[in-house]
Amino acid sequence: KEMKVKNIFILAAMSLTLASCSDLFEPAEENNRGLDEIYNEPTYAQGLLGYGYAMLPYNTKSVTDIATDDAVSNDLTNSFLKMATGSWTANSDPMSRWTNGRASIQYLNIFLQEVDKVNWAKDENARKMYCDSRKGEAYALRALNLYYLLMNHGGWTADGKLLGVPNLTEPETSTDDFNKPRNTFQECLDQIYSDLDEAAKLLPLDYNDLTNDNDVPAKYKEIGVKTAGDYNRVFGSIMRGRISGRIAEAIRSQVSLLAASPAFSEGTNVDYAKAADDAATV
């Protein structure tokens, strides 16, 4: 009888051990987050938008002198050293914006496709304002990333055509044709200007706090935003550092100056008069 009881305990212990090891036989799902998770998690959605900021070429190191005769790098694999010693090729281009620029535009296209579905706030009026604000930033960032792609990869062909880059306004999927031809430089300019126009409609000129409820923009009064405090929650000084309407106009000025320059002016409809007008707007 004592042996039977002992066997029962042994069997019970074994069953618990096997139950606790079920994960060994049934692997857990991969920890990959799906796109549908952005709808109820605004911070996740902002990660898509944030990529457009993070990949901008504003972190240039101070040691770029090694691309000239003024300094020398001891790192033989350094891209700037290769650039200075005659190895500047398509596979070794320290000034390239292709990978980061194209990736940024892909993320921004996904964001623009999904932004209206994101629950930015529990309050519906705040949700609509956040949607406008983030969408305006995305349009401006797409324009800015396309500008850097044009500046680095646009140019004249042997037969005298001024080409830009493939102009993408929809997210690419794994089944898409990636052999897209380059759009003309002017077509890329038109897309940039169009995106900046959209950004200007959605963003405030500057992120300043309103002090009077009567100053709430009419389009937001119409949807029920009644107080300056509600407006400031989305468009107030707390948002400084993000792209504003004025920054979008500054981007337009940069783009027009590039297009009107001697390098590109003969292939565009932009001249220095337009560049000056755009600069004056800022």
Predicted regions and their residues:
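Surface-exposed extracellular loop regions of Gram-negative outer-membrane beta-barrel proteins
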Residues: D23-L24, E249-L257
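Surface-exposed intrinsically disordered loops and tails
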Residues: R182, D206-S237
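Conserved, well-structured interaction surfaces
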Residues: E41, Q46-G47, S79-W156, T173-D190, ...
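Acidic, serine/threonine/proline-rich low-complexity intrinsically disordered regions
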Residues: A250, A259-D277
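Bacterial Sec-dependent N-terminal signal peptides
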Residues: K1-N31
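Membrane-proximal, proline-rich intrinsically disordered regions
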Residues: C21-T68, N125
